[in-house]
Design a protein with these regions (language model features):
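Extracytoplasmic small-molecule ligand-binding "clamshell" domains
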Residues: 1-51
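Bilobed "Venus flytrap"/periplasmic-binding protein-like clamshell domains
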Residues: 1-11, 73-148, 223
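Acidic, polar ligand-binding/catalytic clefts
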Residues: 33-90, 101-102, 110-116
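A bilobed periplasmic-binding-protein/Venus flytrap-type ligand-binding module shared by bacterial periplasmic
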Residues: 74-85, 189-204
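Alpha-to-beta junction loops
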Residues: 36-45, 94-96, 135, 143-147, ...
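A ligand-binding cleft/hinge motif common to bilobed small-molecule-binding domains
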Residues: 44-57, 110-116, 149-177
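Short beta-strand->loop
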Residues: 60-70, 126, 170-188
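An extracytoplasmic/periplasmic, membrane-proximal ligand-sensing/linker region
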Residues: 1-7, 195-260
Length: 260
């Protein structure tokens, strides 16, 4: 993160910014605290957590972020090829693994797909916990590698994460490529977003936006962007991406109210 800070700060002297530092948060709750107490000015996040920070800590969306050339991604829900499961409706009475409660593509988006099918869901502490016949049991695997392995070993019946993680899985494991199959692909959501504190001065916000929008065409920013989660550019939300974000915002609220 620091190389991009070092690129941005010298270009903001005209609005009074002369230094910057990186402050890491262990989870979204700590980042909310930082924002409310004025300890953080600029946050980069996946859209699910970014919208949560906007709703609960007053953060303002600034720009959307292109990473590794991708402006959006989807979630996939997959099963073992021998499971006999070919449709989301067949997950009733079964189990699904997600990555973590803060993940957009490996929790919020696939969970929303299940909710849209009106499938009741119940949290499990462990994949070995007994299944409830009238709901979809869900459990957090903590890492994408665990998630895929649990489905492959039949510890759970299904898993959900991003299409980019799925593509990576297909490249690195012949066994996973042979034995796992996607049964559902969601609509796309923006890949990532930049947010600023609700207390940021308008002139500072405008200058930060200007600097970030120009970074992808500035050779001096190339290495800093690469180290910033392989960012390849920043862009303003258009009507289509705004609609995607609003749908995700409503869905995330529903998921949190119903499941958390």
């Amino acid at each position: 993160l620091k190389p991009l800070i070092d690129y941005v700060v010298p270009r903001m002297k005209d609005v009074g910014i002369t230094e910057g530092r990186v402050l890491m948060a262990r989870d979204p709750q700590q980042m909310m605290s930082y924002l409310r107490r004025g300890k953080v000015d600029w946050v980069t996040e996946t859209p699910g957590t970014g919208l949560l920070l906007a709703d609960r800590a007053g953060a303002r969306p600034l720009l959307l972020t292109e990473r590794s050339g991708s402006r959006e991604y989807r979630s996939v829900i997959f099963t073992h090829r021998d499971s006999g499961i070919t449709d989301l409706s067949q997950l009733l009475g079964k189990t699904i693994a997600f990555q973590s409660p803060s993940s957009t593509s490996a929790y919020l988006v696939p969970a929303l797909a299940l909710r849209e099918r009106r499938l009741p869901m119940g949290l499990m502490v462990s994949p070995l916990e007994g299944r409830e016949p009238g709901s979809v049991g869900y459990v957090f695997a903590n890492t994408d590698a665990n998630l895929a392995a649990w489905v492959h070993k039949r510890l759970v019946d299904a898993g959900g994460f991003s299409d980019q993680d799925w593509d990576q899985l297909q490249r690195v494991s012949e066994a996973f490529r042979r034995d796992l199959v996607v049964i559902h692909t969601t609509d796309p959501v923006p890949r990532a977003m930049e947010l600023v504190s609700g207390n940021m001065a308008p002139a500072v916000e405008a200058r930060l936006k200007e600097v970030l929008l120009g970074a992808s065409t500035d050779p001096q920013a190339r290495d800093a962007l690469r180290q910033f989660f392989r960012t390849t550019g920043f862009y303003e939300a258009d009507p289509a991406s705004q609609a995607q974000l609003e749908k995700l915002r409503r869905g995330a609220r529903e998921i949190r109210e119903a499941l958390e």
